[in-house]
Curated annotation (Swiss-Prot):
GO cellular component entries: endoplasmic reticulum membrane; Golgi apparatus; membrane; plasma membrane
Keyword field: Cell membrane, Endoplasmic reticulum, Lipid biosynthesis, Lipid metabolism, Magnesium, Manganese, Membrane, Metal-binding, Phospholipid biosynthesis, Phospholipid metabolism, Transferase, Transmembrane, Transmembrane helix
Organism: Rattus norvegicus (Rat)
Protein's UniProt name: CDP-diacylglycerol--inositol 3-phosphatidyltransferase
Active site (UniProt): 72
Topological domains, Lumenal: 27, 95, 161-174
TM helices/strands, residue ranges: 6-26, 28-48, 74-94, 96-116, 140-160, 175-195
One Pfam family cited in the UniProt record for this chain: CDP-OH_P_transf
Highest taxon, organism lineage: Eukaryota
Cofactor: Mn(2+); Mg(2+)
Free-text cofactor note: Catalytic activity is higher with Mg(2+). According to PubMed:7998949 the cofactor is Mn(2+), while Mg(2+) is much less effective.
Length: 213
């Protein structure tokens, strides 16, 4: 039986398309906000499809999980870099957001791998109740991730326009009001990620040291 080419699995091909769309978005961000945001949101939307494809085709892989997470982190980070350029007074907040996002996911993934999980989304159900809901409820996970990305995307668009009026309020401004609490909640969950992962790593270190005594 011929060896399977993991790199050509359908979910991973979708992942490559996400990267291409994200790069196109970054290229247009300085000059063409609607083109840039369309490609950015398309890249994010495909994130939902690669997971469905992986489950439907039985093509879930460690490489695919890593590709998915890295694409998410890098795309968000690049958008935040652009936001820091557009809103220089808020640069520190964007820097903190980037640092928290990358650090929390990396440490959580690393602690999951060390503990023997195949993916950062496979958690011990006896662990933190907030993370348990976050990773076992697909609607909750989708709402928080999509709302967070939409908040930053709307903040980018808001720099250029308030959007079409809905009553007396611009659509982009209204969208920011709706998604801001979601983005804040996502940041709180990232802090929980970081603290929980740090405790897990410390517990593993303590167990290893106890074995050596």
């Amino acid at each position: 039986m011929p060896e399977e080419n993991i790199f050509l699995f359908v979910p991973n091909l979708i992942g490559y398309a996400r990267i291409v769309f994200a790069i196109i978005s970054f290229y247009f961000m300085p000059c063409c906000p609607f083109t840039a945001s369309s490609f950015y949101l398309l890249s994010g939307l495909l994130d939902a499809f690669d997971g469905h494809a992986a489950r439907a085709l039985n093509q879930g892989t460690r490489f695919g999980a890593m590709l998915d997470m890295l694409t998410d982190r890098c795309a968000t980070m690049c958008l935040l870099v652009n936001l820091a350029l557009l809103y220089p007074r808020a640069t520190l907040l964007f820097q903190l957001s980037m640092s928290l996002d990358v650090a929390s996911h990396w440490l959580h993934l690393h602690s999951s791998v060390v503990r023997g999980s195949e993916s950062h989304k496979m958690i011990d159900l006896s662990g933190n109740p907030v993370l348990r809901i976050y990773y076992t409820s697909r609607p909750a996970l989708f709402t928080l991730c999509a709302g967070n990305e939409l908040f930053y995307c709307l903040l980018y668009l808001f720099n250029f326009s308030e959007g079409p009026l809905v009553g007396s309020v611009g659509l982009f401004r209204m969208g920011l009001w709706i998604t801001a609490p979601i983005a804040l909640l996502k940041s709180i969950i990232s802090v929980i990620h970081l603290v929980t992962a740090a405790r897990n790593m410390a517990a593993l270190d303590a167990a290893d040291r106890a074995k050596k005594k």
